[in-house]
């Protein structure tokens, strides 16, 4: 089965635990978090977009299309995912958050191998400790189900995935890690 895939970096949140600062634009080392994400994604996939609900001019400077959620009021990652699924011309979208700069360099390959089965519409990352559903490969075939799920008031990402046959794909620490940065202190403590 040949499928087309694009990638979307989710940078549309409120970042409450970061004092409202736009996470993707915060500096880690000498680069913004979004630059770290782009640098890890580009060897894996060429067609990248950024989902951001503020500071769109800043995000556009990285040279990729930027779009905001169609649903108002920062309704969480599923809102950005729905907008992406509605806009894409690809069969699947690889989603990553903007605050997890050390994710595996084989993320796409491993998730793609899980969706080779025509019935698998979502594959998401996990490691030895827990699931990481924001790192996922999702089929556009799910956009109607996702629209209805959000309209019902639900926002739980992992629940949506499990209800729709999502498959977890295990990654080892050697492949990369899913440590994310939620506070400015987290960023200051990390040396790269």
UniProtKB/Swiss-Prot annotation:
SUPFAM superfamilies: Nucleotide-diphospho-sugar transferases (SSF53448). It is found in: Cytoplasm. Mg(2+) binds at residue 99. GO terms for cellular component: cytoplasm. Gene3D superfamilies: Spore Coat Polysaccharide Biosynthesis Protein SpsA, Chain A. It is an enzyme of class 2 (transferase). Keywords: Cytoplasm, GTP-binding, Magnesium, Metal-binding, Molybdenum cofactor biosynthesis, Nucleotide-binding, Transferase. It comes from the Bacteria. One of its GO terms (molecular function) is nucleotidyltransferase activity. One of its GO terms (biological process) is bis(molybdopterin guanine dinucleotide)molybdenum biosynthetic process. GTP binds at residues 10-12, 23, 51, 69, 99. Pfam families: NTP_transf_3. It catalyses: Mo-molybdopterin + GTP + H(+) = Mo-molybdopterin guanine dinucleotide + diphosphate. Its EC number is 2.7.7.77. The keyword Membrane does not apply. Its cofactor is Mg(2+). InterPro entries: MobA-like_NTP_Trfase, Molybde_CF_guanTrfase, Nucleotide-diphossugar_trans. Monomer. Transfers a GMP moiety from GTP to Mo-molybdopterin (Mo-MPT) cofactor (Moco or molybdenum cofactor) to form Mo-molybdopterin guanine dinucleotide (Mo-MGD) cofactor. Belongs to the MobA family. The N-terminal domain determines nucleotide recognition and specific binding, while the C-terminal domain determines the specific binding to the target protein. This is Molybdenum cofactor guanylyltransferase. The gene is mobA.
């Amino acid at each position: 089965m040949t499928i087309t895939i694009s990638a979307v970096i989710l940078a549309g949140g409120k970042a409450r635990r970061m004092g409202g600062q736009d996470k993707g634009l915060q500096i880690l080392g000498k680069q913004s978090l979004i630059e770290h994400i782009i640098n890890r994604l580009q060897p894996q996939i060429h067609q990248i977009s950024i989902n951001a609900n503020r500071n769109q001019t800043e995000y556009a400077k990285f040279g990729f299309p930027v779009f905001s959620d169609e649903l108002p009021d920062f309704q969480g990652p599923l809102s950005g995912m729905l907008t992406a699924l509605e806009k894409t011309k690809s069969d699947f979208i690889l989603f990553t958050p903007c605050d997890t700069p050390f994710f595996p360099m084989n993320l796409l390959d491993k998730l793609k191998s899980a969706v080779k089965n025509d019935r698998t519409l979502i594959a998401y990352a996990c490691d030895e400790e827990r699931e990481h559903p924001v790192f996922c490969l999702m089929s556009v075939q799910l956009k109607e189900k996702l629209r209805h799920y959000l309209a019902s008031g639900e926002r739980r990402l992992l629940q949506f995935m499990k209800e729709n046959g999502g498959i977890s794909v295990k990654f080892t620490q050697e492949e990369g890690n899913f440590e994310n940065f939620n506070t400015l202190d987290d960023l200051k403590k990390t040396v790269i």
